[in-house]
Amino acid sequence: MKFIVFLGAFLWHLMPVSAQVKGMVKDNQGEPVVAANVFWINTTNGTVTDENGTFTIEQPVGAKKLVVSFIGYENDTIVVENDHKELAIILQGSVMMDEVQVVERKIGVVKSRSSVLNQDMISSAELARAACCNLGESFTTNPSVDVSYADAATGARQIKLLGLSGTYVQMLTENIPNYRGASAPFALGYIPGPWMQSIQVSKGSSSVKNGYEAITGQINVEFKKPQTTQSLNVNLFASSKEKYEANFDANVHLNSRLSTGVLAHYENSTRSHDDNGDGFLDMPKVEQYNLQNRWAWMGDQYVFQASVKAMKEDRTSGQATHLHVDNSVGGFVGRELYKIGIHTDRYEAFTKNAYIFDKERGTNLALILSGSLHKQDAGYGYKLYNVDQKNLYTSLMFETNFDERNSISAGLSLNYDYFNQTYRLENDDTGLLYGKEKETVPGAYVQYTYNWKDKIILMGGIRADHSDIYGTFPLKRKIPRSYIRM
């Protein structure tokens, strides 16, 4: 019996015995490191620190090196001897990299894949890159639209699409026909660049919704909306040619549904420039005041928008001085300088009203009312052209989706123009001529669209308008479009 007890004690003494290792892990600030990894090298034995940064781990026979690691700190390896006490481990912060900034510029020009029209959208990012001062200068970075001077003496510009310019391109603001008739020659300068949120350029055949005037395409300008984020922006501009501009826009949310916005613009480029010394101004002198106030009500079913705008502009050009005067034969002595002066007052207003019957199907009924008063007094030497144009436009539209592929829209419209003109066609002091013109054009349209997953889009529409001057004329649109999107 004694032999058995002695043998058991001897074998127990020969068996490997594992000890417990205790310790605490802190950072270099003296704060405990929670959930740090603690393990022996070349073993599967490990643990983590508790909420106080302490740990307890069994030490296998032969294990000497204890590793402590945690994210954001350098690993620490401790050699543990047999006669160790409780370990106190300090983790040092790992090497920190400098801040990395990833900068991306928003896409400036977007090709609309979901639109049946051949449409490019110029976003606010592209407008900022162009550093434009008005609509006419906003296409400098976009090759899809060609803007040229129709008359260098007055600064009148025109847009060319598909090789044709002038009246073949329809101008829209907020999808409402605008800048027609007397306002067309200088319309590209009436819209300040900082006011614009985006521009949609459609080439070729367009929708029948907006009338019959678009032959080569449409250009629609979207202004900054008051219902977007509240903001205050001030934009100042000055050039070496002594052109100065100041722009201001602000949005205020009166409550969760009602908001208003104010946009203001002042332009002054009244210094005379005759760099080539030919006696004529190289560019017209322009001073413009522009002010717009917008309101928006965004209800669950009823949506309302309204805007009023006023603009005043003085534009002068022509001869700056007489050159090559020959006093022996009279020369130009006693003759007046050839001057061009154009004074414009323009007032606009519109309202948009929409009632949504079914949001899922997009069923809605909308009424648009728009009006403008354009008064222009122009003198070209002795020639005169003074015109007062009044325009009224209204449109009633209904739209609905039968399902996710088929939709239809129908509507009625009325456009009224009145011109009161005073002019002199001869370059002398002959008498004035007078003329009054008016035109009323009611119209109706129906348009059907088939859209298969934005890959195959077919649109067909028919429109009929009746002019009290030119009679009735129908307009048909059939625009197929298909592509494969990967």
Predicted features along the sequence, with ranges:
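Short, acidic, small-residue-rich periplasmic hinge/interaction motif at the N-terminus
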Residues: K26-E31, A36-I41, S69-Y73, D83-A128, ...
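Short, acidic Ser/Thr/Gly-rich low-complexity loop/linker segments typical of extracellular
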Residues: T44-T54
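Short acidic/polar hinge/loop motifs at secondary-structure boundaries
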Residues: F55-E58, Q158, I176-K203, L291
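N-terminal periplasmic accessory domains that precede
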Residues: H84-I90, L135-S138, R157-K160, L172, ...
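Extracytoplasmic beta-strand/coil segments of soluble accessory domains associated
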Residues: G136-P177
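Predominantly transmembrane beta-strands of Gram-negative outer membrane beta-barrel pores used
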Residues: Q170, S198-S202, Q218-K224, S231-S240, ...
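Flexible loop and strand-edge segments within Gram-negative outer membrane beta-barrel domains
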Residues: S269-N290, A296-L365, G371-Q389
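Structural signature of Gram-negative outer-membrane beta-barrels, strongest in the C-terminal barrel
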Residues: R405-S409, S413-F419, N427-M486
